[in-house]
Amino acid sequence: MKRTILILICCLVALSSCKKSGIDAFRGDYTFKSSGEVFLQREPSGESNIIPATFNYTLPNEIGQLEIRTLDSKENTVVVVMNYMNGEVIVTQGTCKDQEIVLEEFQRNALKVSMYSYISTSCIVNVNATGHIYDDSTIVLDMVYEGTATIANLNYHIRGNSIQMVATRN
C-alpha cells in the first residue's frame, strides 16, 4: 500500500512539472481579437475649425488568425503570421523566453481612423508588441502604435499604448 502511494505521488510530481516554456509554449494556431485606443495630435499647420487639434480614437475590434512557427530553436526565434479578417496579413519574427514573447517591430498599413460620418483615412503605424501566455492556451499581447495620418489635408501624429490582442489556441 505504501509503495502504491509512493508511486502515485512520484507520477503526480512528474506530470505537474511538464509545463511548456519558450517556443514550445507558443507554437501553434490561434484565433485573436484586438482592441484599444490611440491618441492623435495634429502637427502645427494652418487652422481648421472642423477637425480638432487632438483627439482619442477607439479602434474598432479586429479579429483574425494568428500562427506561430519555429524559426530557430537554438535562438528561441519564431515566425508570427497575423491574418486579419479585413484581408491584411502581417508577417514578423519574435523571440520566446519562458512564458514571454517579444515581437520585432512591424508595420500596419490598413489601420483606418474615422471621424464624423464623412472623414476617414488609412494610417501607417509601427507596432511594438510583447506578451505572455497563460494556461498554455491564451496569449495576451500588449501593443504600442506609433505613426502618422493625414486627415482632411492635415497631418497627425498617432500614439497608442493601450492596444491589446488576445489570442486563444485553436
Residue ranges and their predicted role:
Residues 1-4, 19:
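Positively charged n-region of N-terminal signal peptides that target proteins for export
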Residues 5-10:
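Sec-dependent signal peptide hydrophobic core
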Residues 14-17:
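C-terminal motif of bacterial Sec signal peptides marking the signal peptidase cleavage site
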Residues 24-48:
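Tryptophan-anchored aromatic micro-motifs
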Residues 30-32, 78, 103, 133-147:
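A short hydrophobic beta-strand element
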Residues 39-54, 109-118, 150-156:
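Flexible, solvent-exposed loop segments that connect beta-strands
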Residues 57-129:
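Predominantly extracellular/secreted and cell-surface proteins with exposed
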Residues 136-170:
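Edge beta-strand at a domain terminus
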